[in-house]
């Protein structure tokens, strides 16, 4: 299988190195990643600016752009053979609930899904400094080898692995997205007149406790796998909204 590996933590991150080290033993891996940290960039693309792309060797490229840029160049830049699977991660920190709308990790995988590739985003709850993520990568390899034939194109499979996990498929749970809440704080530095610099000082993160969600699985020590559709239409409201507007216009 031809696997494009990318992330939003940058080319030097331990998570992407672990995926490549483990997967290249049995698959053809092609690594293309941002030059620097690009967290919370979702599916941003560089459409007005050129991007500097550096070829390290035949299968390694660095892009001065966003994670979705990396996927786009990997798929359409005539540098790799046809890619079967877009694999994004392993992210240092989880992406669950509403996180998925901001995440560059998930955004990169979603871009693969837009272009009809199998797409998997992987995040870890282990944010220990200098951790190597090899155990997580081995689990991902096992999952791909066992189940990739059952996955569908046009779907993003979002996997979150707890800090202390049992590396067994019996520990995997298929989940839905939970509800994340954010309480953001900013610091401000006044420059001159009405000009000021704002810095996101941090976010207090909470989540709802509900059965069947990624949060519930994760915090009970299970590995969550959530299938994410590209179609974000709220089907339940389509007819209701149509009927409501029709009545108001009649």
UniProtKB/Swiss-Prot annotation:
Its cofactor is a divalent metal cation. It comes from the Bacteria. Binds 1 divalent metal cation per subunit. It catalyses: a ribonucleoside 5'-phosphate + H2O = a ribonucleoside + phosphate. InterPro entries: SurE, SurE-like_Pase/nucleotidase, SurE-like_sf. It holds the Pfam family SurE. It is found in: Cytoplasm. A divalent metal cation binds at residues 8-9, 39, 91. Keywords: Cytoplasm, Hydrolase, Metal-binding, Nucleotide-binding. Its main location: cytoplasm. Its EC number is 3.1.3.5. The keyword Cytoplasm applies. GO terms for molecular function: 3'-nucleotidase activity; 5'-nucleotidase activity; exopolyphosphatase activity; metal ion binding; nucleotide binding. The keyword Cytoplasm applies. GO terms for cellular component: cytoplasm. Nucleotidase that shows phosphatase activity on nucleoside 5'-monophosphates. Belongs to the SurE nucleotidase family. This is 5'-nucleotidase SurE. It comes from Leptospira borgpetersenii serovar Hardjo-bovis (strain JB197). The lineage of its organism: Bacteria, Pseudomonadati, Spirochaetota, Spirochaetia, Leptospirales.
């Amino acid at each position: 299988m031809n696997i494009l590996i990318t992330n939003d933590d940058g080319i030097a991150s331990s998570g992407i190195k672990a995926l490549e080290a483990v997967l290249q033993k049995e698959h053809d891996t092609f690594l293309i990643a941002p030059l620097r940290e690009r967290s919370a960039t979702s599916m941003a693309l560089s459409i007005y600016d050129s991007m500097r792309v550096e070829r390290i060797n035949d299968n390694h490229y660095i892009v001065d752009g966003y994670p979705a840029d990396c996927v786009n160049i990997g798929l359409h830049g005539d540098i790799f053979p046809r890619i079967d699977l877009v694999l994004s991660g392993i992210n240092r920190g989880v992406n669950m609930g509403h996180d998925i709308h901001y995440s560059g990790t998930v955004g990169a995988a979603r871009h693969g899904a837009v272009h009809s590739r199998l797409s998997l985003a992987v995040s870890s709850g282990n944010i220990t400094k200098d951790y190597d993520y090899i155990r997580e990568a081995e689990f991902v390899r096992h999952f791909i080898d066992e189940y990739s034939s059952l996955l569908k194109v046009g779907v993003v499979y979002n996997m979150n692995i707890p800090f202390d996990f049992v590396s067994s498929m019996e520990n995997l749970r298929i989940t839905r997205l939970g509800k994340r809440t954010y309480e953001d704080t900013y610091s401000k530095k006044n420059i001159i007149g009405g000009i000021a610099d704002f810095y996101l000082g941090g976010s207090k993160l909470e989540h709802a406790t509900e059965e069947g969600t990624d949060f519930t699985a994760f915090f009970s020590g299970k590995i969550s796998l959530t299938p994410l559709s590209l179609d974000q239409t709220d089907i339940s409201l389509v007819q209701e909204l149509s009927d409501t507007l029709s009545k108001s216009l009649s």
